[in-house]
Structures are given as C-alpha cells and as structure tokens.
Amino acid sequence: ENTDHIIRGKLRLKQFTINTKTNKTSIVENPYLQHIDVNFHYNLDFPIQSKRNSQFIYCTIFDSAMGLIRGYVKVDTYNFHESIPRVFLFPKHMYGNSEPQVVEMNNEEYLMTFSNRFEKSYISLINVKTGSMNSINIPTRIPPGFHSIFYDR
C-alpha cells in the first residue's frame, strides 16, 4: 500500500457546463461514478474521448491505495447524471501502465494500453462493445506511467 498517497478515493469525474451568454456555470455529478462496484478506494483520471462517438469518454480507474491502474470506465456524456458507466477491469494481478488509447479495427472500437503482470509487459486490447480483453506479451519492460500514442501508418 502506498502510504504517501494523500488523496484516497476522492477524485471523481464531474461535468462542468458554462453558459457563455449568461456567464453562469453548473457542475453535475454522476451518482453512479461515486460508487463504482469495486472493492478498493479509487480515483478517476485521464479522460479520453471515443473516436467513433464523441458522446462517450473513457477514464482510468486508479487504485488510490496501491497506486495502480486497475481498469477503465466508459461514461456517456450526453446523459451524464443518469447513465450507469461500463466498467472494464484488468484480471487479478494485472495492471495498466497509463491511460488507454482509443483505436478502431474492423469497425470495432478498442481501448489499447500497455499493461503488466508479474514483471512481464503486455499490449492489451479491450473491445468496448463486448468487454473482452486480449493481451499480447512484449519482449521489453514498460514502466508504470509510460505515456504513448498509437497511430495508423
């Protein structure tokens, strides 16, 4: 457990709306994001937008006690305050290294990220429609916090 970590389970995604005509702002919370069904203290961080539909974003589920990325959550921004988010968790003893990238293959959207399990590094693909995850072992160590970008060539 990371005892130096100050914020434990307090960072949540909020929607800020700014009306440029009236200069009024509002903050909306999603009650479902306050209580994701996981058995650890968590923060949500590093939101990224879907490439197929700007209505959806994906956030990193960060285990605040262990200092590890345990999964990702899909959030509907059009129905923010009432939508139940879709949660994608890594298998036991597997952790993400950083925020995912959204990639499209064969008309399907995936989250692609580096991950690790027992000192081995992987590239993991999560199908956001089915929730299935496939991981491919890579022959080098990828450290936690490694940021990346994937692009088509």
Residue ranges: model-predicted function:
Residues 1-153:
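Beta-propeller domains
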